[in-house]
Design a protein with these regions (language model features):
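Beta-strand-rich modules
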Residues: 92-116, 228-250
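Membrane-topology and secretion signals of cell-surface/extracellular proteins
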Residues: 22-27, 37, 42, 48, ...
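Short coil/turn motifs at secondary-structure junctions
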Residues: 53, 66, 112, 154, ...
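C-terminal motif of bacterial Sec signal peptides marking the signal peptidase cleavage site
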Residues: 2-4
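Intrinsically disordered, phosphorylation-rich cytoplasmic tails of plasma-membrane receptors
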Residues: 6-9, 41, 70, 159, ...
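Recognizes extended acidic, P/S/T-rich segments that occur
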Residues: 50, 58-98, 161-231
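Pro/Thr/Ser/Gly-rich low-complexity, intrinsically disordered linker/stalk tracts
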Residues: 7-55, 99, 114-156, 251-268
Length: 268
C-alpha cells in the first residue's frame, strides 16, 4: 500500500502533533474514536484529543481512499476552527463519504502564521447503510420492550453483529444504561422483514468479563452490560449499530452503519 501526502511543510511555531482518540469497543459505555454515526445524516466520525496550545488557528482534516494501484491519495476535506461555535474542535463527522468504501483520515494542527504540525496517526473506517428503526417509539407500557428494526444491507456487506444502546434522558450525563451485543441470526430478512429482539436485564457491570446471562437472554447474545432490572417509568432513547466487518486480532468493528436515536417513554 502506497500513501501519498502533500509537500513538506513549515512548522515554525512548533505546533503539536494531534493525537487521535483510540477506538472503543462497540459495546463500551462511551463511544470513542473513529466510528459510524448518525446526526441528521449518516457519516464517519473521527475524534482527537483537545489541546490548549497557543497559536493554533484550526485543524486541517485529510481524507484518502485506495486507488486502483493500491495508493492512498490524501486531500484536505475541511478545516475545523477553534472559534467555530457550530463545530466541536475535537470531533468531526464526515457525511460526504460513499457507502462500502474504505476511507483513511489524518489531521494536522495549523498555526496562525500558517505553520503546520506533523500528521496525526492515520485511522480508517467503512460506512454501511443505517438500520431502519421501527419500535419502541413514543409511549409504551412495557418494562421489557421489544426492539424492532429493518436491517438495511447490501450484498457482500451483510450485518454480522448488532449492538443496541439505551440511554436514560432523565440523567444529566446521558451515559448508556444498557448495552447488548449479539450475533445476526436473521440472514435472509435484510431490507424487507422486521427483526425483533426483546430487552432482558443485564447480569454484569460495565467492563466486567461476562459469560453468564439472564435466563431470558436469547442464545445469540455476545455481551450485555448495565441495567439489572426492568425499565422503570421514564424517558429513554435507543439506537442500533449493525456491524459487517470486525478485526479478528483486536475485535474492533471496521465497517458498520448506525441508526439515528429514537425516543420513547415508559408509563405503566
Amino acid at each position: 500500500m502506497i500513501i501519498s501526502c502533500d509537500a513538506p511543510f513549515n512548522n515554525s511555531l512548533n505546533m503539536e502533533k494531534p493525537i487521535m482518540v483510540p477506538k472503543s469497543n462497540a459495546e463500551d459505555r462511551k463511544e470513542l474514536g473513529i466510528d459510524s454515526e448518525f446526526r441528521l445524516k449518516s457519516g464517519i466520525q473521527i475524534m482527537w484529543y483537545s489541546s490548549d496550545e497557543i497559536g493554533r488557528d484550526f485543524y486541517s482534516i485529510y481524507r484518502g481512499s485506495e486507488t486502483s494501484n493500491s495508493a492512498i491519495n490524501f486531500t484536505e476535506i475541511t478545516k475545523v476552527y477553534n472559534d467555530d461555535i457550530l463545530l466541536n474542535d475535537t470531533v468531526y463527522l464526515d457525511t460526504t463519504v460513499l457507502l462500502h468504501e474504505k476511507y483513511y483520515y489524518f489531521i494536522r494542527s495549523i498555526g496562525i502564521d500558517g505553520s503546520q504540525s506533523s500528521s496525526s496517526d492515520t485511522v480508517s473506517y467503512i460506512l454501511n447503510e443505517s438500520p431502519y428503526i421501527i419500535s419502541p417509539v413514543n409511549t409504551i407500557s412495557d418494562s421489557f420492550p421489544e426492539f424492532t428494526w429493518i436491517d438495511n444491507s447490501s450484498i457482500y456487506y451483510f450485518s454480522n453483529e448488532f449492538v443496541i444502546r439505551i440511554e436514560n434522558l432523565e440523567e444529566n450525563n446521558l451515559n448508556a444504561i444498557w448495552i447488548a451485543k449479539f450475533y445476526n441470526i436473521w440472514f435472509g430478512l435484510e431490507n424487507y422483514s422486521p427483526i425483533s429482539f426483546r430487552f432482558f436485564p443485564a447480569t454484569c457491570e460495565w467492563s466486567e468479563d461476562c459469560d453468564t446471562f439472564h435466563p431470558n437472554a436469547p442464545s445469540n447474545v455476545m455481551s450485555c452490560y448495565g441495567l439489572k432490572e426492568p425499565l422503570l417509568e421514564g424517558s429513554y432513547r435507543w439506537k442500533l449499530k449493525s456491524i459487517s466487518l470486525v478485526n479478528n486480532e483486536n475485535g474492533m468493528d471496521e465497517s458498520s452503519g448506525e441508526s439515528p436515536w429514537k425516543y420513547f417513554n415508559v408509563e405503566y
